Amino acid sequence: MDVENEQILNVNPADPDNLSDSLFSGDEESAGTEEIKNEINGNWISASSINEARINAKAKRRLRKNSSRDSGRGDSVSDNGSDTLRSGVTVPTSPKGRLLDRRSRSGKGRGLPKKGGAGGKGVWGTPGQVYDVEEVDVKDPNYDDDQENCVYETVVLPLDERAFEKTLTPIIQEYFEHGDTNEVAEMLRDLNLGEMKSGVPVLAVSLALEGKASHREMTSKLLSDLCGTVMSTSDVEKSFDKSLKDLPELALDTPRAPQLVGQFIARAVGDGILCNTYIDSYKGTVDCVQARAALDKATVLLSMSKGGKRKDSVWGSGGGQQSVNHLVKEIDMLLKEYLLSGDISEAEHCLKELEVPHFHHELVYEAIIMVLESTGESTFKMILDLLKSLWKSSTITVDQMKRGYERIYNEIPDINLDVPHSYSVLERFVEECFQAGIISKQLRDLCPSRGRKRFVSEGDGGRLKPESY
């Protein structure tokens, strides 16, 4: 080893002036540099010591440069915890050498989450890490005892009159489509109605007056289900009081409003959401003609219910809820009343109130049957005028009219057994309907006809047979 070091010194002789730059750097090693110069000038230091000093200085520079970067990788300190380098050089333990060291003094840090650490950039801590509950410092100058045990909840402002009508009108109109009272109740609970609870029946009744009979039935059912959950019986009484006061204005848009409001009152008393003495409390105190008519209508309906008539039938069952037999009877009664009165508008109104546009072909069928069974011309002409009016007003559609005629065409052989002249009457009626524009030419051509029987004296083609004598 000494021989190799001597050869190295001979090849690269050490320059005393540049020794400080090659061996040490920094102010902390300035004293050691001057001592080495003196020792070299004294010519008593060995070559092996110089080489060892160079290696130690190089290791110290590397350690100082990579101390903060390589502190957690174990490149500088051995695995057994000793302060010895893998090359065998001892790590300097000078307090001044650790002054600018960024490594944690305890080896593990303070245990706090680091921003940009395991959770990612800008995240404090790893995902799912649970921190301790922050305890309130009572001695904190900003401490407020009112902030402890606070419960926060969303506060909905009460609706004013304008917002009330704007918010509830779509809800009630949508209810007329789906008929789910529970959904309406849930939506009303989310609103802060406040003192406007009594306005719910008023708005519902006013919208139902402009609708159909089925809408009024649904409104009565809605009021019955909402009473006790969203509003009380006193709210219902206040609402009907307001409806009676508003009857003069309601009658301008709906002339039948007094009778309809009376039916609503009778139904409410029957459902138990109005007390039985509600109508009696108005006796002798009503000056409005419309309000008096509404109360009289309610009194009549309630007196009829005592005789066994159900109060649920004040509106009837609308639309598809009715049975086929019931609809057939209603249409038959409608046609008979029309033949007696001759009022086409009333017949059209009664047909619309049935709310069965898919069953209008039954009216066409029954009307033609009456024509075939009649013996005079009045029924023929009145039924023709009725079908013409219903066709022009689009009350009966093309498909319903066509279906009614096709039913007659298919059943005319059986009808002819009871009505011998049905074929000829049907041909004449179909031709008149075509001339009036009620049916198309194609539908007219489908009308069945029965061939005329030839007499015995008629030959082929209608020619008379020549006499054989």
UniProtKB/Swiss-Prot annotation:
Binds EIF4A1 via both MI domains. This is Programmed cell death protein 4. Residues 163-284, 326-449 form the MI domain. Residues 114-125 have a biased composition (Gly residues). Belongs to the PDCD4 family. A motif (Nuclear localization signal) lies at residues 58-64, 448-454. SMART domains: MA3. The keyword Nucleus applies. The modification Phosphoserine is found at S25, S67, S68, S71, S76, S78, S94, S313, S317, S457. It comes from Pongo abelii. Inhibits translation initiation and cap-dependent translation. May excert its function by hindering the interaction between EIF4A1 and EIF4G. Inhibits the helicase activity of EIF4A. Modulates the activation of JUN kinase. Down-regulates the expression of MAP4K1, thus inhibiting events important in driving invasion, namely, MAPK85 activation and consequent JUN-dependent transcription. May play a role in apoptosis. Tumor suppressor. Inhibits tumor promoter-induced neoplastic transformation. Binds RNA. The modification N-acetylmethionine is found at M1. Residues 84-93 have a biased composition (Polar residues). Polyubiquitinated, leading to its proteasomal degradation. Rapidly degraded in response to mitogens. Phosphorylation of the phosphodegron promotes interaction with BTRC and proteasomal degradation. Phosphorylated at Ser-67 by RPS6KB1 in response to mitogens; phosphorylation promotes proteasomal degradation of PDCD4. It is found in: Nucleus; Cytoplasm. PROSITE patterns: MI (PS51366). Transmembrane segments: none annotated. InterPro entries: ARM-type_fold, Initiation_fac_eIF4g_MI, PDCD4. GO terms for cellular component: cytosol; nucleus. Residues 1-38, 58-128 are annotated as: Disordered. Residues 74-83 have a biased composition (Low complexity). The keyword Ubl conjugation applies. Interacts (via MI domains) with EIF4A2. Interacts (via MI domains) with EIF4A1 (via N-terminal domain). Heterotrimer with EIF4A1; one molecule of PDCD4 binds two molecules of EIF4A1. Interacts with EIF4G1. May form a complex with EIF4A1 and EIF4G1. The interaction between PDCD4 and EIF4A1 interferes with the interaction between EIF4A1 and EIF4G. When phosphorylated, interacts with BTRC and FBXW11. The modification Phosphotyrosine is found at Y152.
